[in-house]
Amino acid sequence: MSSSPLSSSLFHPLSTLSTHCHGRRQNLCFNRKQQPFVVRAAKLPEGVIVPKAQPKSQPAFLGFTQTAEIWNSRACMIGLIGTFIVELILNKGILELIGVEIGKGLDLPL
């Protein structure tokens, strides 16, 4: 035995692994029969224009695309600034404007 803990005689390369099955030698790496590869091509109808390059957009993850996120953040900024302007002009908070009493705590009897 050699001094290394993993001797090369213990492990064989995958290409040399084989088994005998019903008198035949089968390779473990490629135990499926190879099927012939058939290519079927069709001509495009007249007037169909083939794009020169495929678009390089990535598929959206649950609807979160870059463009949707940009528009969402812009709408949020407009709404937030609009809320600040309304509160500044009317000198009341948004909750006070819709009739919710604030500043009284939870008003729970203990």
Swiss-Prot record:
Gene Ontology MF term list: chlorophyll binding
Disruption phenotype annotation: High light sensitivity leading to stunted growth with pale-green leaves on agar plates, but unable to grow on soil. Impaired photosystem II (PSII) core protein function and reduced levels of photosystem I core proteins.
Reported impact of residue 69 to A: Abolishes chlorophyll binding of OHP1 and OHP2 heterodimer
Induction cue: Induced by exposure to high light. Expression follows circadian diurnal fluctuations with highest levels before and shortly after the light phase.
Localisation: Plastid, Chloroplast thylakoid membrane
Record bears the keyword Repeat: no
Transmembrane segments: 75-95
Record key words, sorted: Chlorophyll, Chloroplast, Chromophore, Membrane, Photosynthesis, Photosystem II, Plastid, Thylakoid, Transit peptide, Transmembrane, Transmembrane helix
Stromal side: 42-74
Role description: May play a photoprotective role in the thylakoid membrane in response to light stress. Involved in photosystems I (PSI) and II (PSII) core proteins function. Forms a trimeric complex with OHP2 and HCF244 that is required to promote PSII core subunit assembly. The trimeric complex forms a transient PSII reaction center-like complex with PsbA, PsbD, PsbE, PsbF and PsbI subunits in thylakoids for early assembly of PSII as well as PSII repair. The trimeric complex is required for the recruitment of ribosomes to the psbA mRNA during PSII biogenesis and repair.
Record's protein name: Light-harvesting complex-like protein OHP1, chloroplastic
